[in-house]
């Protein structure tokens, strides 16, 4: 998986990028063999320079895997919390899409089976 980082209103440090890379191991396990051709574009930073308290930090990610695109965004009090929320949301998006694909495959298989059993 290729990760590209961008910082908005914030200077990214190597510690932050290492932390995000470790967090993305949770996402990699859902991708399986499709992990090799996955590209993640991650944007992290402060909402505005003027905000001092509240949900000041945000993290969003566009993940492109095998022609499909997944998007997750989160805002939180700290950058670490925003990254945690974003990775969790991205994992839910991927699992949901995989469940839909599996359901459609089963439905199509059932229809095909019924079609071939019609003549009996």
What are these regions (language model features)?
Residues 1-120:
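N-terminal, polar/charged subdomain of small-to-medium soluble alpha/beta proteins
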């Amino acid at each position: 998986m290729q990760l590209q980082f961008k910082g908005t209103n914030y200077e990214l440090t190597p510690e932050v990028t290492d932390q995000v890379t470790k967090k993305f191991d949770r996402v990699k396990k859902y991708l399986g063999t499709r992990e090799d051709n996955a590209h993640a574009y991650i944007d992290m930073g402060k909402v505005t320079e003027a905000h001092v308290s509240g949900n000041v930090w945000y993290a969003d990610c566009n993940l492109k895997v095998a022609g499909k695109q997944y998007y997750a965004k989160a805002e939180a009090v700290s950058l670490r919390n925003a990254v945690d929320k974003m990775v969790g949301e991205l994992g839910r998006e991927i699992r949901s899409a995989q469940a839909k694909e599996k359901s459609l495959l089963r439905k199509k298989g059932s229809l095909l089976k019924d079609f071939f059993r019609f003549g009996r």
